[in-house]
Curated annotation (Swiss-Prot):
Gene3D superfamilies: Enolpyruvate transferase domain. This is 3-phosphoshikimate 1-carboxyvinyltransferase. It comes from Escherichia coli O127:H6 (strain E2348/69 / EPEC). It catalyses: 3-phosphoshikimate + phosphoenolpyruvate = 5-O-(1-carboxyvinyl)-3-phosphoshikimate + phosphate. The active site is at D313 (proton acceptor). Phosphoenolpyruvate binds at K22, G96, R124, Q171, R344, R386, K411. Catalyzes the transfer of the enolpyruvyl moiety of phosphoenolpyruvate (PEP) to the 5-hydroxyl of shikimate-3-phosphate (S3P) to produce enolpyruvyl shikimate-3-phosphate and inorganic phosphate.
Length: 427
C-alpha cells in the first residue's frame, strides 16, 4: 500500500484557494441537467465523487463540455426528468452525493436503471429514502441486501404524502426535495425523527431557488412542494469553495500559525461547515471573516464539549485538533459519522489511540484526552478522504506521521497534501 510520511511542521502561513464544494457541485450538476437551458458552472470540484456524477449524466444522455482542468462545465439541460433509452446500470463508486439524489430523480417517469457502487456503498443505508419514494409511487427493488444498494429503479414516482426519516442522513431529504417539483402531483414531505445536518438542507433549498424553484419549508418538519414545475438555468453559477476542506487549513493555523487564509467561502457562505471556524474560536484561535475569505491565527487551544450535529464532516477535524488542546474534548450527537465513507466514530477512535490519546467511543459521541507527547504512528485511512486529511494535522507536533493510502483524498481534494506542503515550514 502506498504511504506518505509527513515530517514535523514548525509553522503554517499562507493562502489557500479552496476547490469547489462537493455538496454544491453534485447538486448543481444534477439541477443543471434537469433544467431548461444551458448552464455554465464555474469552480466545479474535480474529484472522484463529481466524476461519478458526470459519468452518470453522460450515460443518461446529458451533453456537457468540460474545460481542460475540469472546473468549468457547460451543461445543456434536459428540460425535465432524465430518461435512459434502454435498461442501464450506473456505477457510482462511493459517492453518496450521486447515489442518493439520482436514486430519487431517476424514479420520475419510466426508466429501468440499476444503481450500484463500491463495496462500501453497499454498506451505506438507503432504506429510508427508498421507503419514502415508494410512498410516492416509485417502483424500487433491492438487488442484494434489503435497505442497501444496489437498487433497480423502474420509475413511478408521482408525488403525494411522503414521510422520510431525517435521523440518519440529510441526503435522503435532499434527494426528495430536488425530485418532487418535477413530479406530476404536489408532494408533502413529513420528517420523522430529528433532522440531522440541517445546514445541508439549506444548501439544497438555496440551489433549487437559484434554478427557479421555491418550496414551502414548515420549520424543517414538513415541506410542501408544488408538482409539475420545471427548473430554469440561472445562466452561469459559481460553485462556492468547499467549507469542509477549509477546516484542515484553519485548524492547522489554530495549532501552528502564523495566519492561514482560505478563499472561496466567507461570512455569507451557504455551507453550514463554515461554522467550524466558530468552534476554533471557542477553543482559543483568532478568526477573521470576509465576504469571500476566512482567516485563522494561532491561539492557546482549550478543550470543548459540544453538540456537533450541525457540522458532522468538519467536526472530524476538531477530533484531531483536540490533540493540541488543553483538557478533554467531547464531541456529541455525531451518530451519522457511522454511516459515512467508513464508520468514522470507530475509525477516529482507533487511530487517535495509535498516536497516544485516551479515547472513549460512545454510540453517538467521542471523548478525547491528548497525551503529553504524540507518538509516531502509521495511520490507516479506511478509504476515507477525511481520515487522511484529519490525521495530517498530527505533523503539527514534533512527531512525524505516516498516512496510508494518501490518494484517498481524491474523493474531494486530489491535491490536498501539495496544498498543505505549500503553507508548511519545517523546523
Amino acid at each position: 500500500m502506498e504511504s506518505l510520511t509527513l515530517q514535523p511542521i514548525a509553522r503554517v502561513d499562507g493562502t489557500i484557494n479552496l476547490p469547489g464544494s462537493k455538496s454544491v457541485s453534485n447538486r448543481a450538476l444534477l439541477l443543471a441537467a434537469l433544467a431548461h437551458g444551458k448552464t455554465v458552472l464555474t469552480n466545479l470540484l474535480d474529484s472522484d465523487d463529481v466524476r461519478h456524477m458526470l459519468n452518470a449524466l453522460t450515460a443518461l444522455g446529458v451533453s456537457y463540455t468540460l474545460s481542460a482542468d475540469r472546473t468549468r462545465c457547460e451543461i445543456i439541460g434536459n428540460g425535465g426528468p432524465l430518461h435512459a433509452k434502454s435498461a442501464l446500470e450506473l456505477f457510482l463508486g462511493n459517492a453518496g452525493t450521486a447515489m442518493r439524489p439520482l436514486a430519487a430523480a431517476l424514479c420520475l417517469g419510466s426508466n429501468d436503471i440499476v444503481l450500484t457502487g463500491e463495496p462500501r456503498m453497499k454498506e451505506r443505508p438507503i432504506g429510508h429514502l427508498v421507503d419514502a419514494l415508494r410512498l410516492g409511487g416509485a417502483k424500487i427493488t433491492y438487488l442484494e441486501q434489503e435497505n442497501y444498494p444496489p437498487l433497480r429503479l423502474q420509475g413511478g414516482f408521482t408525488g403525494g404524502n411522503v414521510d422520510v426519516d431525517g435521523s440518519v442522513s440529510s441526503q435522503f431529504l435532499t434527494a426528495l426535495l430536488m425530485t418532487a417539483p418535477l413530479a406530476p402531483e404536489d408532494t408533502v414531505i413529513r420528517i420523522k425523527g430529528d433532522l440531522v445536518s440541517k445546514p445541508y438542507i439549506d444548501i439544497t433549498l438555496n440551489l433549487m431557488k437559484t434554478f427557479g424553484v421555491e418550496i414551502e419549508n414548515q420549520h424543517y418538519q414538513q415541506f410542501v412542494v408544488k408538482g409539475g414545475q420545471s427548473y430554469q438555468s440561472p445562466g452561469t453559477y459559481l460553485v462556492e469553495g468547499d467549507a469542509s476542506s477549509a477546516s484542515y487549513f484553519l485548524a492547522a493555523a489554530a495549532i501552528k500559525g502564523g495566519t492561514v487564509k482560505v478563499t472561496g467561502i466567507g461570512r455569507n457562505s451557504m455551507q453550514g461547515d463554515i461554522r467550524f471556524a466558530d468552534v476554533l474560536e471557542k477553543m482559543g484561535a483568532t478568526i477573521c471573516w470576509g465576504d469571500d475569505y476566512i482567516s485563522c491565527m494561532r491561539g492557546e487551544l482549550n478543550a470543548i464539549d459540544m453538540d456537533m450535529n450541525h457540522i458532522p464532516d468538519a467536526a472530524m477535524t476538531i477530533a484531531t485538533a483536540a490533540l493540541f488542546a488543553k483538557g478533554t474534548t467531547t464531541l456529541r450527537n455525531i451518530y451519522n459519522w457511522r454511516v459515512k465513507e467508513t464508520d468514522r466514530l470507530f475509525a477516529m477512535a482507533t487511530e487517535l489511540r495509535k498516536v497516544g490519546a485516551e479515547v472513549e467511543e460512545g454510540h453517538d459521541f467521542i471523548r478525547i484526552t491528548p497525551p503529553e507527547k504524540l507518538k509516531f504512528a502509521e495511520i490507516a485511512t479506511y478509504n476515507d478522504h477525511r481520515m487522511a486529511m484529519c490525521f495530517s494535522l498530527v505533523a503539527l507536533s514534533d512527531t512525524a506521521v505516516t498516512i496510508l493510502d494518501p490518494k484517498c483524498t481524491a474523493k474531494t481534494f486530489p491535491d490536498y497534501f501539495e496544498q498543505l506542503a505549500r503553507i508548511s515550514q519545517s523546523g
